[in-house]
């Protein structure tokens, strides 16, 4: 395989995606390893290496004695074609061994439209797609991530799911597997043992029955497994594992910077937001711990930017203390500090003025809806006055770029709400004219609308999704009311959002459609 591998690298785009060898990748001696895990991200290297969850769990598993976790990413179409043409199986970046050589194969599920990539990666690894076709204790396939809160569309393919946060459950899973391997247990015996770990769902132990109209009637567990699976959470973020020595990519990735997770959960409760509900309760790290982790990460990686990651960064209670500590380190070294997920109702000009000394970036806000009535309906607790006041403060401080994110198709939305988006944009433009301190540069407003996708375990999980035709009508209605040259409007395509809703809320029968699409050659999630 090695000779073929090197030859095909010269025929594909961005070969650095496939070779590994990055600074801080973890290499172990196979003689010292008794459990090998192939950690698969069902998307490209550039996206997967930007994922903080994957970096955390990669470190968690490799901290365990006798365990070697290696990375696997979905190949781009040109590489997949070469692999199929030459019979080259999917490999890991660290050892370049075939994925089929590994004890356990883990997938992280962060986006429903990557489900087809899970099947494609298993096929490229020359591993049977269906769980029932995989015998023995080798090639155990499990999955976690936010999409695992509804595991049913992938239930026929995945041996078990880890629901909730993975730092603690992952180590328990691997220790359970290590014990089963030493005892020579069968796959079924291992699955019965792992099902006793909190947060673990083994689909084959639950029988689904349906009514005559096709709706779900009941889910019956086998004896000895929980009727309901309780999600796992990390109780103490200050002591939770965080990788300060992370892999430095060999090629440019989507988010090419250090990421500092400041807290999990969200106090806001927006009714459409799955992460806001699934990652409750709020758990924060202290500013002292965060400063220490940030400095260690920056010194090790050499990155020129660090981002404070959370669902709502400006809600962090020690934000100014943390920012002051980080800026004392970052400013003299010309390292940019980025604060995404800011809210218009608690924007601090003084804080932002200091943060922007290294590099002034644009403002980003997500009002989500164009009128106060609809913002109240979705529990987006921000007023038009707060949005305009924040923009006035920022414009007077020298900002001249604003990104605005909205959704179309939210429950109870009317044409008045759609037109309200354009009206809010023009009010922001008027605020710029009255308060902008750098008018020679002009104002740039980047406006984006997404097609509302109802997600499980949110208050809107049962809401209907508008048709693609109605979505496009609302897009065109908004476009017809946007005339300012400074506004760049972009909208999501409707077809993918419709499929996303099906995958997000579907049951096991969706898996049959996934399998059929795979057999017909669907590859749109990557390409």
Question: Which residues fall in each region the model found?
Answer:
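A glycine-rich phosphate-binding loop feature that marks nucleotide/adenosyl-phosphate handling sites
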Residues: 193-204, 311-316, 340-346, 409, ...
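Iron-sulfur (Fe-S) cluster-binding segments and ferredoxin-like electron-carrier domains
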Residues: 273-289
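N-terminal [4Fe-4S]-dependent radical SAM core
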Residues: 8-38, 45-46, 203, 209, ...
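Conserved small/polar residues in nucleotide/adenosyl-binding loops
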Residues: 526
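Glycine-rich beta-alpha loop elements in corrinoid/cobalamin-binding modules
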Residues: 74-220, 456-507, 514-521
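Conserved SAM/AdoMet-binding glycine-rich loop
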Residues: 40, 113, 295-403, 408-444
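N-terminal pre-triad scaffold of radical SAM enzymes
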Residues: 39-43, 61, 248-274, 298, ...
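Short secondary-structure boundary/capping segments
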Residues: 54-56, 86, 122, 156-161, ...
């Amino acid at each position: 395989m090695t000779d073929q591998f090197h030859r095909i690298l010269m025929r594909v785009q961005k070969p650095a995606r496939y070779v590994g060898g990055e600074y801080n990748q973890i290499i172990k001696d196979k003689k010292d390893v008794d459990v090998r895990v192939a950690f698969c991200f069902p998307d490209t290297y550039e996206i997967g290496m930007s994922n903080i969850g994957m970096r955390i769990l990669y470190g968690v598993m490799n901290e365990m004695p006798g365990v070697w976790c290696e990375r696997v990413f979905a190949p781009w179409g040109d590489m997949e074609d070469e692999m199929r043409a030459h019979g080259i199986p999917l490999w890991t970046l660290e050892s370049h061994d075939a994925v089929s050589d590994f004890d356990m194969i883990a997938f992280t599920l962060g986006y429903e439209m990557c489900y087809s990539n899970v099947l494609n990666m298993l096929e490229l690894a020359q591993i049977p797609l269906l769980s029932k076709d995989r015998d023995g204790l080798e090639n155990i396939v499990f999955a976690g991530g936010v999409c695992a809160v509804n595991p049913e569309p992938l239930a026929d393919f995945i041996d078990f799911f880890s629901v909730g946060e993975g730092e603690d459950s992952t180590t328990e899973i691997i220790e359970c597997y290590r014990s089963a391997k030493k005892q020579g247990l069968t796959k079924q015996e291992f699955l019965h043992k792992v099902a006793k770990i909190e947060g673990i769902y083994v689909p084959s132990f639950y029988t689904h029955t349906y009514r005559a109209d096709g709706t779900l009637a009941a889910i019956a567990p086998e004896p000895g497994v929980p009727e309901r699976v309780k999600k796992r959470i990390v109780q103490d973020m200050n002591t939770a594992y965080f990788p300060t020595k992370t892999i430095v990519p060999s090629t440019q990735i989507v988010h090419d910077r250090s990421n500092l997770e400041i807290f999990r959960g969200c106090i806001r409760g927006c009714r459409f937001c799955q992460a806001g509900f699934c990652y409750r309760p709020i758990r924060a790290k202290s500013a002292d711990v965060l400063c220490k982790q940030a400095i260690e990460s920056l010194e090790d990686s050499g990155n020129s930017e660090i981002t404070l990651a959370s669902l709502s960064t400006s809600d962090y209670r020690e934000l100014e203390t943390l920012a002051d500590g980080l800026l004392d380190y970052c400013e003299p070294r010309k390292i940019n500090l980025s604060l995404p997920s800011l809210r218009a109702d608690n924007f601090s000009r003084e804080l932002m003025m200091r943060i922007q000394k290294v590099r002034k970036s644009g403002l980003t806000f997500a009002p989500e809806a164009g009128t106060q009535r609809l913002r109240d309906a979705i529990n987006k607790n921000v007023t038009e006055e707060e949005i305009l006041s924040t923009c006035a403060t920022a414009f007077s401080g020298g900002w001249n770029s604003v990104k605005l994110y909205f959704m179309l198709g939210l429950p109870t939305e009317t044409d008045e709400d759609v037109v309200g988006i354009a009206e809010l944009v023009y009010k922001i433009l008027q605020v710029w004219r009255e308060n902008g301190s750098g008018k020679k540069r002009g104002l740039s407003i980047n406006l984006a609308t997404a097609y509302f996708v109802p997600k499980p375990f949110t208050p809107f999980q049962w809401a209907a999704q508008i048709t693609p035709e109605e979505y496009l009508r609302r897009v065109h209605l908004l476009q017809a009311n946007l005339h300012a040259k400074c506004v760049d409007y972009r909208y999501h395509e409707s077809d993918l959002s419709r499929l996303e809703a099906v995958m997000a809320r579907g049951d096991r029968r969706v898996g049959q459609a996934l399998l059929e699409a795979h057999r017909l050659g669907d590859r749109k999630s990557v390409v």
